[in-house]
Amino acid sequence: MPTLNLSISELMELSYVKDLEKIMYAIRQFKGEVKGIEGDNIIVELEPDRPDILCVEGLARAIRSFLEICYPKFPFSAFKNPNIEVYVGNVKLRPYIACAIIRDMRIDNNFIKSLMNM
C-alpha cells in the first residue's frame, strides 16, 4: 500500500480541520492507517484504489467532503480566445488537455514537494 509522509499543518490548513483526531478518524474511514507522527509530519498508509487521495490536496478534499465541511468557492473566468496549441498524434485514448492560468498563488516547498509526488 502507498505510504505518504504529509505535513500536518498543511493538511489542517487545506482540510479546514484543526483537530488531529478528526483527521485521523477520517483517514481510517478511507481504509487508511496512520503509521506514525514525527514532528509536524503524519505518516499515512492508504489503499491504492483511491488515487485521488494519494496527495495532501486530494486527501484534504476527501476529508472536507466526508466531514461535510463547506469551503470557499474561488472565482474563475474563461478566456475567449485561449492561445494554446497541442499536437496529439495518433492517440485514441484521452486525446484531450486541461489547463489553467493561476495568479496570486503562494508556492512554497510543501507545494513543490506535493507536485513532485503526484
Give residue spans per PLM region.
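Phosphate-rich ligand and nucleic-acid binding surfaces
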Residues: M1-M118
